[in-house]
Amino acid sequence: MRPSACPGLVRVVAAADGGLCRIKLPGGRLDARQARAIAAVAQAHGSGVIEATNRANLQVRGIRAGEAGALTRALLDAGLGPLVDADGDAAALAASDDVRNLMLNPLAGRDPDALVDSAALAAPLLDMLAREPRRFELSPKFAIQLDGGERIAALDHPHDIWLAAWRRGDGAVRIAAGLAGCPPVAAGAAPALVDVAPADTVALVRALLLAFLDLAPADTTRMRALLATCGAHTLLARAQAALPFPLAADPALRDWRRAPSDPALRFGAQPVRDPGRCSVGAQFALGRLDATRLDRLAALADAHGDGTLSMTPWQGVFVHGVATGAAPTVRDALAALGLVVSPGDPLARMVACAGSAGCAKARADTKRDALALAARIGTVRDLHLTGCERHCALPHPAAHTLVAVGPAHYDLYRRDGAAGLGTALARHLTIDEAAARLGEARPSQDPYDA
């Protein structure tokens, strides 16, 4: 088994504010009963603070010493663990939990514009991952994306293996696949490497996983690092040995590009396959909620929806099965709970790591500073506040990044052609100085405003 300090359902890790437990939600989904269970354990065994992650999961913070076991058992009883090994030893349970790193789009199985029902496709994939004998060898960070062609999609979030539905010239829907990246959207993006029939998706993923494990040295835990040494063609050749069908790419895949997704669609009512129903989306301010809010969100899902929720890769949520006429009521209720409900809200594109309140490595209380910045700027900016050089909470550089150098002081970077975060614009800015600089930024510098 590869050692890891990543939090999980069983592996509660120490943080500055107590224990941290990450609850991996299959495709980001949970029902109202499970949401109440998470709220209850956060209150009973932790500080009551809950975070939404950029992989559509939830994590409970501030877990008190000696209470991790009781918290894990309560979450397992609520059906929030893997379907296998729930009664097994801790190592087997942790391994089965770790491999559930499968991200779907928030309207998977509901979007009328999707090419495939990716929620249905995900079920056997998750089952395979949980039962694979070599799952112990995978890093908990190893992640897979399954994109069914939904209108609302996170297409800039790199994964070790990505899968995306596309329609071939003869009308057949296929599953394109690539490694260490994202489905191609821009003209210059790397194309898919192979494509398979939807029914062969599970076999393809398993073959790619086994090829990775066969080829990767013990200290190589992610696909990008392996490809830097052996190349994609070597890995595909190894995967081919585990497949009963030939691996190939349709010639048209070289020019295929996934349709862009409008990030604003994660807010408000969105149509679904069920006539007269919709899903209503909102975003947790800076990814933070608490037990009371989650409990009330569960009540809202029961009262006005079908009792189900989906967390999103933007640290948000969709309430599903809402009658179209009730959408404004649900939106207002989400706003009353403190969620961001409009793409024009200054917090809509702002991300902050846990900060010094939750992480010993952070040099500043990033979430508190982000709220102060949002109030001063008053407009939308694609902005990431990070407490140190690890740049947690965002999988790719934002248009602007503030890196803490001390309490309430930051270096400001602008993403451009320069490596890393981009060009350093200013050093040791106070919150007021940072707000002034960001307020002067041209709208064209922010991809949200482009």
Question: Where are the predicted features?
Answer:
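Gly/Thr-rich phosphate-binding loop signature of adenosyl cofactor/nucleotide-binding cores
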Residues: M1-A39, D87-A90, Q240-A299, V340
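Short acidic (Asp/Glu) and glycine-rich catalytic loops that position anionic groups and cofactors
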Residues: A16-D17, P183-G188, L215-D219, D274-C278, ...
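Small-residue-enriched alpha-helical segments and adjacent helix-cap loops
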Residues: G18-A172, V194-D195, A203, F284-P407
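Flexible, glycine/charged-enriched surface loops at secondary-structure junctions
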Residues: G48-A52, A86-D87, R135-S139, L213-R238, ...
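Well-ordered beta-strand positions enriched in small/hydrophobic/aromatic, beta-favoring residues
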Residues: L102, A177, V280-A282, L412
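Residues that form generic nucleotide/phosphate-binding pockets
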Residues: M128, A211, R238, A242, ...
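Mobile "lid/hinge" segments at catalytic clefts and subdomain interfaces of large enzymes
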Residues: L138, F142-T229, H396, T401-A450
